[in-house]
Amino acid sequence: MAAEGKNVLIMAGGTGGHVFPALACAREFQARGYSVHWLGTPRGIENELVPQAGLPLHLIQVSGLRGKGKLSLLKAPFTLVKAVLQARRIIRQLKPVCVLGFGGYVTGPGGVAARLCGVPLVIHEQNARAGTANRLLVPLSARVCEAFPNTFEASDKRRTTGNPVRPELFMDAQRTPLGERRARLLVLGGSLGAEPLNKLLPKALSEVPAALRPEVFHQAGKQHAPITAERYHEAGVAAQVEPFIKDMAQAYGWADLVVCRAGALTVSELAAAGLPSMLVPLPHAIDDHQTHNAQYLAREGAAFLMPQATTGAAQLAERLNEVLMQPEKLNVMAGTARRLAKPAATSTVVDICLEVAHG
């Protein structure tokens, strides 16, 4: 354990969208000489990623309430009180100078416990529409960080920081000018794949004239890669289909255009990589946050927002034809995306935490 006054507690769990930006901040804290501890729950992805990063993981028992039965709802107050007490015990033991929350079920009880222990609380919201836990924790927080402008109401606490993303994404890709080669299309559906995109892209690309058709690199998810490859074959479209892309920085560096969902980190990574995109938000995301994320790039002209309900193969093919016939349009969109990036997001969030800890 680090010397007293050098511990930081990070709270993040459930999905990679919460955990990956938190890990980026953890590395920055460590680079500045702080010992980072992690608060999570037993079921989230943090149980795999945090130990892999060599960080001590502390667990509390808490889960979400959406879609739960009446018995679970009746038990909820007792479960939450128990989780707060568990988190308070951990905070008292670690004596962190600051608690930094990135969302997930763990953040609510952990944030309340931080306030009870008198430890400064900073929250970071990755999406353009704030999650429930972060919205409720605003009054208890010393600072509220937002990835996208105006996610929270204006106040002295609010700071627009961007999302912490991998620094290698900000490196300029040395691409051959578009007029001298075929365009390159990257299709992303997340690590598990997005089956509607897997079905849509082969059909849409078959309607793009062969002379204009881009090279295609498609991440389809482990379960869906074989059938997606078969769909491309049946459509007469050449494509490289993979279950999962391990080196996203390389994939972004290769691409000229991306078709994907609109998760918070994906949107931030597209800006960091300076890539134009066609964003098809997940229709059933909580609070429709993916549509709000997509609007951030679309409003500025860095992306096209294409709702799944109204985007068929013909509509997507029409949009692809439009940009593939105008390479200069892709170049303008790429420049706009890069201008929206926040390369200092990680260091800014850590600066804010240490400011409230020692200020």
UniProtKB/Swiss-Prot annotation:
Belongs to the glycosyltransferase 28 family. MurG subfamily. It is found in: Cell inner membrane. InterPro entries: GlcNAc_MurG, Glyco_trans_28_C, GlycoTrans_28_N. It is a peripheral membrane protein. Its EC number is 2.4.1.227. It comes from Pseudomonas putida (strain ATCC 47054 / DSM 6125 / CFBP 8728 / NCIMB 11950 / KT2440). UDP-N-acetyl-alpha-D-glucosamine binds at T15, G16, G17, N127, R166, S191, I245, A264, L265, T266, V267, S268, E269, Q290. This is UDP-N-acetylglucosamine--N-acetylmuramyl-(pentapeptide) pyrophosphoryl-undecaprenol N-acetylglucosamine transferase. It catalyses: di-trans,octa-cis-undecaprenyl diphospho-N-acetyl-alpha-D-muramoyl-L-alanyl-D-glutamyl-meso-2,6-diaminopimeloyl-D-alanyl-D-alanine + UDP-N-acetyl-alpha-D-glucosamine = di-trans,octa-cis-undecaprenyl diphospho-[N-acetyl-alpha-D-glucosaminyl-(1->4)]-N-acetyl-alpha-D-muramoyl-L-alanyl-D-glutamyl-meso-2,6-diaminopimeloyl-D-alanyl-D-alanine + UDP + H(+). It comes from the Bacteria. The keyword Cell membrane applies. GO terms for cellular component: plasma membrane. Cell wall formation. Catalyzes the transfer of a GlcNAc subunit on undecaprenyl-pyrophosphoryl-MurNAc-pentapeptide (lipid intermediate I) to form undecaprenyl-pyrophosphoryl-MurNAc-(pentapeptide)GlcNAc (lipid intermediate II).
